[in-house]
């Protein structure tokens, strides 16, 4: 089985390289690949990659994820998040391939306090959400064999993440202010990759699982409580911090070009039932990531 992975060097793409390898022959690209086009600013190029390789499975971990930047470059965000996804969907349909694609809770308006269902009405607050929703719709229209996983608050041990930023600031400052009115579940790239690999195996044997799913860790937190956990674990590990006061503030304290949803909770019952998996609490993955961070690198 040939598996084509786009976006191999991103947070999720990096973990997918590990998780997908046992499933078959993994062919992975990113924007800099030269043998074939992996650059999503070239829709026809990535479609030609699909037609040339003729994979059984396509996993798309490439996206324009700079939420604030998307507000000032909506055409580019649309090109990456929707136009190229449509091109891949059409090419995948031609060669009979499955497409696994990642989307976001930002397709929702972010109000209320109930976890969003796959069937809830969408109403994006920003350009990023609009373009990701357009990508979803294109894939649904042009390639029946698809799995779309909406996720949120994604982190990974590789590269920058919220926890690393908080730890750096807590070493430099005695007081920090963190938002406490946005709710979601920090979800590890490791978890997304492992769930994706399992879902692919299920889909190959049960094609009727094709469709849209919500995929995040269990439980709910705020950025403030997330930060508090990071600092608690750091102190347990003997990491010296200058911080002595953590303040909770509303979203309005940090104005940004793109509006953020207050409610990023996603209901994952459909995913857990269809793929016979249990999604662990968000703290499990975060504590594991922090433990690796504390024991393998200088923060």
UniProtKB/Swiss-Prot annotation:
The EC number(s) this enzyme carries: 1.1.1.133
**Where, by residue number, does dTDP-beta-L-rhamnose bind?**
104-105, 153
- Kindly list the positions annotated as binding NADPH: 11-12, 39-40, 63-65, 102, 128, 132
What are the site positions for Could provide a fine-tuning to achieve optimal pKa matching between active site and substrate? 104
Biological process per Gene Ontology, one example term: O antigen biosynthetic process
Entry keyword set: Carbohydrate metabolism, Lipopolysaccharide biosynthesis, Magnesium, Metal-binding, NAD, NADP, Oxidoreductase
- Indicate whether Magnesium appears among the record's keywords: yes
Molecular functions (GO terms) = dTDP-4-dehydrorhamnose reductase activity; metal ion binding
What does the entry list as the binding residues for NADH?
10-12, 30, 39-40, 63-65, 128, 132
Per UniProt, subunit arrangement is: Homodimer.
- What the protein does? Involved in the biosynthesis of the dTDP-L-rhamnose which is an important component of lipopolysaccharide (LPS). Catalyzes the reduction of dTDP-6-deoxy-L-lyxo-4-hexulose to yield dTDP-L-rhamnose. RmlD uses NADH and NADPH nearly equally well.
User: What is this protein's name?
Assistant: dTDP-4-dehydrorhamnose reductase
Q: State the encoding gene.
A: rfbD
